[in-house]
Amino acid sequence: MARGKRSTQRDADLELESLQSEIESESPQPVTKSKAKKNKKKLNKASAFNSDNDSNYDLKPEDDEVDEEVVPVKKKPSKKSKKAKANAFEAFADEQSVEEEEEEDSEKPVRKNKKSSKKASPKNAFDALADDMDDLSLDEEESESSEKSKKKKKKSKSKDDGSEALDDGDIESSEKDKKKKKKSKENDDAPKKDRKTRKKEEKARKLASMLESENKDNDANAAPLNKTDAFKDGLPSGRLIFAYASGQKVAPDGSNPADGITVTGNLLSPPNSRDLQVEKLSVSAWGKLLIKDSELNLINGRRYGLIAPNGSGKSTLLHAIACGLIPTPSSLDFYLLDREYIPNELTCVEAVLDINEQERKHLEAMMEDLLDDPDKNAVELDTIQTRLTDLETENSDHRVYKILRGLQFTDEMIAKRTNELSGGWRMRIALARILFIKPTLMMLDEPTNHLDLEAVAWLEEYLTHEMEGHTLLITCHTQDTLNEVCTDIIHLYHQKLDYYSGNYDTFLKVRAERDVQLAKKARQQEKDMAKLQNKLNMTGSEQQKKAKAKVKAMNKKLEKDKQSGKVLDEEIIQEKQLVIRFEDCGGGIPSPAIKFQDVSFNYPGGPTIFSKLNFGLDLKSRVALVGPNGAGKTTLIKLILEKVQPSTGSVVRHHGLRLALFNQHMGDQLDMRLSAVEWLRTKFGNKPEGEMRRIVGRYGLTGKSQVIPMGQLSDGQRRRVLFAFLGMTQPHILLLDEPTNALDIDTIDALADALNNFDGGVVFITHDFRLIDQVAEEIWIVQNGTVKEFDGEIRDYKMMLKQQIAKEREEERRIELEKQKK
């Protein structure tokens, strides 16, 4: 029984792949083949998806010359009834209506051009569907005459034998035939191609539904087939499972990123293109329109930075591509980094190499299917062969070690299993996987989260020098990374995708100039309206009528400009502005507030982390801690907070000193069932609700976001709640461990202003070079058991890191060249 089900499953999978290929070509694949050339059709139309206009689906590739082949049918078609060509799908529908009556008849092969062969009868529903699809490719004239002949024979037989009247199914079929013929006459001018496409898509859906039923029978624990997962541009797709670098499409909470996303638009890129171009793109998530009638243009070889405030739809757009909701050319391979690698028994190296093996198996399966018609699929076969060659590198292990070490993995960590790593390190594993496989379109959603400065510097160098011939689409809250990496900026603003050449600084300059021009234009419109209003008050009735019409037209145009983002520069600044302010600490603490005296530390049974540290902190301190991963930056914060005690030496603190810590795990303290105001009142119950709402508003939480459960807030909004909590404790010294994760650029700038205006001390760890540049007055390097002040600015430190990376890269190239010479 189980073997039979697996056989059925394999048949279904093969049929799905075959059907997908047939629909992608937008023309039925011929089963009856002739050496005569078919009429060639130009590939000059856009392919639409989720569109009401079916004519936009048309992709008309050229038909190739093919050999002749024998096709089994259920009855030999009549040659006497040949007429003008009719729609092949009408014949197919008619054939289905009499299918039950023909089951007892034996199938006979029809000789086509004096050649014959036999085909086995279908054994299950999937085979039956396959035979139905084969019958569609018969010559349309023969299909029509065959079906008419069958109907006549059936009717004649029914009358002669005195058989019973037609059952309800036959009556319904007869009525449907009449309606179809009538509709065919009314739509003679309509393109037949569209009807065929729609019929094929309907068959694909039915087949996918049957496949889902089989999957449920075979494996009760298997995840149900989701239409979003199974279809790409309405087509069955086997590639989508490999589109996520994490190795999983389902989020940690069990949700599918594609759930709730709807997309419309037209694909412009031809099948063999390495670009992704879509016009009239609209994207919605859970009913909220995020992108409206925009163009998506991703040109091969360019590196795009996608920027927008949190909640605007950046991640939704990336998921829409990765989930197949936005169609892509068949030759374009893509991966998305959006979450950490799923923990398992694989080591770090094995986990990275695994993505290579999965991709290779997938490509080989695709190639096997395409080899059924190598002439027709020559372009796709060439693309797959090139991709397979790229995957078959002799130094794969060396590349994996290079990437992992660049992401600051130690040799000890590399040897660990992935289920022994924290979520932050598994995020680096997922990043290493996508960098190793290096798809044609690489999508990175906040890749610098969970990285330290050294890893960020290495990643910037890698993306800048190793992406030739590949396209990058990245969302990132680090302005420095956007400046170092990006050749173009895509600004998602007012539901539109606006494109700017250059990096982030260039975007800011061009955007500011454009805003000024828009402001001038808007002011001029207002002046013109004021003049018209004055004339309106001073003229006669006829002139007043004309002036009123002109004022009305200008008002309408001004309103349209405002809706499209063309507003005054004061309004633009107000929209972008966000203010965060920490409560004053009150002072009263003499310097030094904290003093380290010959402090050494090691965990029980572990190596020495610090040896004889001597330094002090006060309310004027603005210190950024930098250094390689594992050097002890977080441990130093714990020593300051007295969460761990020195092995030797002492840490002296003022008795009235108040400290506050922000770290990656503070979000666990939040009660997601409560609103921000409710949760803060549980911590500071003496403050009335009105005052609490005013305080929360300082941190960018206004209106509805103050009173809805925090489970409905974004990660960035929840971080603002934590900032509000820290500020209300009125600490003398703020300790921040990676505060910028999940914040957008505007919020990071607001945080920098808040720290600069804070009257207490600040000690922080961050991977954001720009935040350090904005806030830090001292840079301390934590390395080799010591803490030393860096003599220079953060730009100098970053330049030093990049020089080391460049030196290592040149050394590797030299070694490779020597190997090639040998």
Curated annotation (Swiss-Prot):
<dbReference type="InterPro" id="IPR017871">
    <property type="entry name" value="ABC_transporter-like_CS"/>
</dbReference>
<comment type="similarity">
    <text>Belongs to the ABC transporter superfamily.</text>
</comment>
<keyword id="KW-0597">Phosphoprotein</keyword>
<feature type="compositionally biased region" description="Basic residues">
    <location>
        <begin position="34"/>
        <end position="44"/>
    </location>
</feature>
<keyword id="KW-0067">ATP-binding</keyword>
<feature type="domain" description="ABC transporter 2">
    <location>
        <begin position="594"/>
        <end position="809"/>
    </location>
</feature>
<feature type="modified residue" description="Phosphoserine">
    <location>
        <position position="47"/>
    </location>
</feature>
<protein>
    <recommendedName>
        <fullName>Uncharacterized ABC transporter ATP-binding protein C825.01</fullName>
    </recommendedName>
</protein>
<feature type="modified residue" description="Phosphoserine">
    <location>
        <position position="51"/>
    </location>
</feature>
<feature type="modified residue" description="Phosphoserine">
    <location>
        <position position="27"/>
    </location>
</feature>
<feature type="modified residue" description="Phosphoserine">
    <location>
        <position position="163"/>
    </location>
</feature>
<dbReference type="InterPro" id="IPR027417">
    <property type="entry name" value="P-loop_NTPase"/>
</dbReference>
<feature type="modified residue" description="Phosphoserine">
    <location>
        <position position="55"/>
    </location>
</feature>
<keyword id="KW-0547">Nucleotide-binding</keyword>
<dbReference type="GO" id="GO:0016887">
    <property type="term" value="F:ATP hydrolysis activity"/>
</dbReference>
<feature type="domain" description="ABC transporter 1">
    <location>
        <begin position="276"/>
        <end position="519"/>
    </location>
</feature>
<feature type="binding site">
    <location>
        <begin position="627"/>
        <end position="634"/>
    </location>
    <ligand>
        <name>ATP</name>
    </ligand>
</feature>
<feature type="modified residue" description="Phosphoserine">
    <location>
        <position position="97"/>
    </location>
</feature>
<keyword id="KW-0677">Repeat</keyword>
<feature type="compositionally biased region" description="Acidic residues">
    <location>
        <begin position="129"/>
        <end position="144"/>
    </location>
</feature>
<feature type="modified residue" description="Phosphotyrosine">
    <location>
        <position position="57"/>
    </location>
</feature>
<dbReference type="InterPro" id="IPR032781">
    <property type="entry name" value="ABC_tran_Xtn"/>
</dbReference>
<dbReference type="GO" id="GO:0005524">
    <property type="term" value="F:ATP binding"/>
</dbReference>
<feature type="compositionally biased region" description="Basic residues">
    <location>
        <begin position="73"/>
        <end position="85"/>
    </location>
</feature>
<dbReference type="InterPro" id="IPR003439">
    <property type="entry name" value="ABC_transporter-like_ATP-bd"/>
</dbReference>
<feature type="region of interest" description="Disordered">
    <location>
        <begin position="1"/>
        <end position="230"/>
    </location>
</feature>
<feature type="binding site">
    <location>
        <begin position="308"/>
        <end position="315"/>
    </location>
    <ligand>
        <name>ATP</name>
    </ligand>
</feature>
<dbReference type="GO" id="GO:0002183">
    <property type="term" value="P:cytoplasmic translational initiation"/>
</dbReference>
<dbReference type="Pfam" id="PF12848">
    <property type="entry name" value="ABC_tran_Xtn"/>
</dbReference>
<dbReference type="GO" id="GO:0005829">
    <property type="term" value="C:cytosol"/>
</dbReference>
<dbReference type="InterPro" id="IPR003593">
    <property type="entry name" value="AAA+_ATPase"/>
</dbReference>
<feature type="compositionally biased region" description="Acidic residues">
    <location>
        <begin position="92"/>
        <end position="106"/>
    </location>
</feature>
<dbReference type="InterPro" id="IPR050611">
    <property type="entry name" value="ABCF_EF3_subfamily"/>
</dbReference>
<feature type="modified residue" description="Phosphoserine">
    <location>
        <position position="137"/>
    </location>
</feature>
<keyword id="KW-0963">Cytoplasm</keyword>
<feature type="compositionally biased region" description="Acidic residues">
    <location>
        <begin position="61"/>
        <end position="70"/>
    </location>
</feature>
<dbReference type="Pfam" id="PF00005">
    <property type="entry name" value="ABC_tran"/>
</dbReference>
<feature type="compositionally biased region" description="Basic residues">
    <location>
        <begin position="111"/>
        <end position="121"/>
    </location>
</feature>
<feature type="compositionally biased region" description="Acidic residues">
    <location>
        <begin position="163"/>
        <end position="172"/>
    </location>
</feature>
